[in-house]
Amino acid sequence: MPSDFTPIFIPGLILTADLFAPQLVGLRTPLPPRVANTLAHDSLTDMAEEALALVDGPVLPMGLSMGGYVAMEMARLAPERLVGIALLNTAHKADDAARREQRMATIKMAQSDRFRGVTRHLLKSFLSPAALGDESIVARVMAMAATVGRENFVLQQHAILGRRDQTDTLRSLQVPGLVLCGSLDTLTPPARSHEMAALLPHSRLLILDQIGHLSSLEAPQAVTDALNALIDDI
C-alpha cells in the first residue's frame, strides 16, 4: 500500500467539519487530512466526485452517516484510488418505505420555515441520552446545523433519498476497512454495521457501548484510536 495517501473526512447530514474536530488533530497520517464538501449538492455521486477531486493519488475516505454513503460512493466510482475505508454510524442500503416517509416529512417541515425545529427534532435521534444532557455537545450540533442551513439540508436529504444499494461495492472492496457504530445508535443501528462488516473482506467491526449516532463527538478518543488503528493496517 502507498504511504502517501490522503485521509478525507466526510461529514453527515446537517453537519460540518467540526464533527471531526477531535480526529482532525489526533490522526496520525503522512499527509494532512482533508474534509469533503457536502453542501450545494443534491447527489451523493456529485459529493463523491468532488471529494475524489480534492487531491491526486490514493485516498482514505472516512465518513459518518451520510458521509459514509459518500465514502461508499467514492469506493464504487474509483476503487483503485482507495487504500482503506472507514464507515462510521452508517448503512449500505437505501431507506425503506417508512424511513423515506420520515425523511420527506422533515423536508416539508424545513421548507415551511421550521428548520430550527427540525434540528431540535434530529437531536433526539443523533445523540444518546447522556450526550443530550451535555450542553456543549448540543450547542456544537446546533451550530453546525445553523452553518449548513435549510437549503443545504433539503439538498442533502434529496441526495440521501437517491442513494443506491452498495452491497456489491463493499463485497468487492479489497482494502482494510473500519466499521464503527454506537450501541445506542437508533438511526443506523449496530445490526447495519454487522451486515457491512460481514460484506467487507478485510474489515474490523467496533461497537462503542452507550454511544449514539454522532460517535466522533460522543466518544472522540475511541473514534480517533480506531481510525489510527485502521491507518496502521494500511
PLM region spans:
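Conserved HGGG/HGGXW glycine-rich cap/lid loop of the alpha/beta-hydrolase fold
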Residues: 1-45, 49, 64
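Flexible "cap/lid" loop of the alpha/beta hydrolase fold
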Residues: 76-77, 81-120
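Conserved alpha/beta-hydrolase catalytic His-Asp/Glu region
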Residues: 95-98, 113-171
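Short beta-strand/loop motif that positions the catalytic acidic residue
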Residues: 173, 179-181, 185
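Short alpha-helix in the alpha/beta-hydrolase fold that links the catalytic acid
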Residues: 175, 189-198
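Catalytic histidine neighborhood in serine/cysteine hydrolases
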Residues: 194-213
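Catalytic histidine-centered segment of alpha/beta-hydrolase-like enzymes
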Residues: 211-224
